[in-house]
Amino acid sequence: MLDLESGPVHLSVEEGIGGTSLCLSLTATVLQSNSRVVWLGRSPLNSERAQAILAELNETQLERLFILEFGNNLLARATALKPLINRLTDTDLLVIDDWCPSSGRAPANDLQAVRGLISSAGNTRLILTSKAYESPSGDGNKWKSRGSQLSGVRQVWLLRQEGFRLSLIHISEPTRPY
């Protein structure tokens, strides 16, 4: 669906539509294939939702899931986790959920952290999520992404559309290396 083997993906999500649930489903699939997942989240996962989505996994599979909350300090967590992330393989997955705050511009420290994580991850499958926001400019594009400052990532949108509960819309390919 997201073709994570083709490089890092930035998923811009309309609030409340299920971006974290989508990433948890991808996490379950990766863990079922006996690979590892490192999950970095700005806030704690909803335990009921996580339990429901990961319910089919056994203890051995769940032992390969590393979940860390970074709050407002992604850069410090990213720096501390660099040795672990350097050991991930192309079958593993790195999820950075809500990598930047949901209002305003992405802080310089968060951008620095994400660029470092992308570089450290190498060929590891990587997905970044952030909240999409409605464009105030009236330039014809209703939605904007907080990840527009990131190069080397594919931009994907998860938005509500008339007649559909949710829709994935592929927008762009990376134009430059990370």
Segments the model singles out, each with a brief description of its role:
Residues M1-D3:
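Pre-Walker A adenine-sensing motif
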Residues T79-L88:
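Conserved alpha-helical scaffold flanking the Walker A/P-loop in AAA+ ATPase domains
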Residues I169-Y178:
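Single conserved hydrophobic/aromatic residue that forms the stacking wall/gate
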Residues F66-E69, L128, W157-L158:
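Structural signal for conserved beta-strand scaffold positions within catalytic alpha/beta enzyme cores
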Residues T20, T129, T175-R176:
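Ser/Thr-centric signal marking residues that sit
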Residues G7-T79:
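Conserved P-loop
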Residues V153-R154, Q161-L168:
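Conserved AAA+ ATPase core "coupling" helix
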Residues L88-Q155:
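P-loop NTPase motor core
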